[in-house]
Amino acid sequence: MNIPRFMPGHVLHTSEDIPQSESPLAGRRTRPVSEAFSSSYRHSDLGGYPPYGLGGSATAGLGSLSAGMGNLNLGGTTPGLQHLGGGLANTATMDSEKWLQDLELYNAILEEMATVSLDKDFKDELSSIEQWFGVLSDGERTAALYALLQQTNPVQIRFFITVLQKFGNMDFDGSPIGNSFENGAPQQQQQTSAQPSPMGQGAMGQAMTGGLGGLGGLHPHQTTHSNLNPNAHNPIYAPVGTFPSTPSHKHTSSLSTEPIGSRRSMIATPEHDLNAQIANTTAMKLAALSTVSNRASLDDRSKRSSFHQHTNSQESTPTKPGTPGGSPAPGAHSLATPMKGHHQTSSSSSITQLSGASSASPATDIKLLRDVSAWLRALRLHKYTECFKDMEWQDIVQLDDAQLEEKGVNALGARRKMLKVFEQVRDAQKDGTLGGV
């Protein structure tokens, strides 16, 4: 049996001969022989194996490297991205809370408006204000509106700004200027503008239609970062009139023409769009509810206008010579037939005499004249009943402008209306055509 010979100066070591070191492997009781031979072979050209383990320190270095590699998570995100994601989550949470608070406030206001719009006393007062406003000059109207705007809150300011912006995009005939309503509904705009109404109700309908149509089409900067807002196409964020979320719409909204270097921030854009959408939605709802309170007075004025047109057509129609009593021609009778049953409270004499008056029946009805309170209520002037509580109607109709102001009728529009009615009553009294006599 041949015993292997080793070079002079080399000693075969076992794991038990190697002293304990600070190596991470020192905790083991034995070491494999392969480690000893590997260490001896690596350092054989140095003239001998180092007595206190270079192999131990090398193993420690490899252990530290292994530990460092273990701490490296190639599948995770960098700390900067984690911080950015947390900031986006916090911003989205704050925006959601603010949106819910604003939504509760808007819903409360809308419910209150709906309740008030059904109040009969409120509608009577509002009708009186409209009639008073209708007789004011341009300067008086501007001064009155400016005084009322001083009492508005932020929600009402948003509403008025939206409505006035829509008014600014319209011509005098109610048609939109340029292509400002390209994203709207042209057919609905034509229908709303064709309905005449006092106090600019037709223009308000145009503003409502244009606003709802504008919310339906998203602008490029609104669709650029739509992936940051998962509820961008949720129905709760979309007002009435916006188109539903379809695959084609989502595909179209994902495209953007906005440059990368835009001054709009990736984080600030969803919040700005959300607040603007909430403001526009609330403004449109307020505009829709604002027409409810005027519906009764609008219907009344429409009926009154139709009645005056009917009576004027009766007066202007020529009569046949052979007809007894000067009855109107068959054509005029056919025009008067649809109007039967609508206004039968006034006598034929008062209709003929006061057909051009703005409020013929209440102004010259003797039954109402005998009750001053009921007469003023029929004229929408019941708020001034206390000014004439000790007077008879014969004395009231003789008052002039200065005397009315002394009585407490400080509003110029109300005094003008009273003077017109007083003149009608005096003329009917002279001619003996007071209704109910």
Curated annotation (Swiss-Prot):
CDD domains: SAM_VTS1_fungal (cd09556)
A Pfam family annotated for this UniProt entry: Vts1
Residue intervals of the SAM domain: 367-428
UniProt subcellular location: Cytoplasm, Cytosol; Cytoplasm, P-body
Keyword terms, alphabetized: Cytoplasm, Nucleotide-binding, Protein transport, RNA-binding, Transport
Top-level taxon of origin: Eukaryota
Ranges of biased composition (kind: Gly residues): 208-217
Gene3D superfamilies per the UniProt record, alphabetical: Transcription Factor, Ets-1
Entry GO MF terms: mRNA binding; nucleotide binding
Biased amino acid composition, Polar residues: 243-259
Region of interest called Disordered, as start-end residue ranges on this chain: 1-40, 175-262, 295-362
Low complexity composition-biased segments: 185-207, 344-361
Listed SUPFAM superfamilies: SAM/Pointed domain (SSF47769)
Main location (coarse class): cytoplasm
Single GO cellular component term: cytosol
GO BP terms in the entry: nuclear-transcribed mRNA poly(A) tail shortening; protein transport
Family to which this protein belongs: Belongs to the VTS1 family.
Subunit structure: Monomer. Binds to RNA.
Function noted in UniProt: RNA-binding protein involved in post-transcriptional regulation through transcript degradation.
Protein name in the entry: RNA-binding protein VTS1
Organism: Yarrowia lipolytica (strain CLIB 122 / E 150)
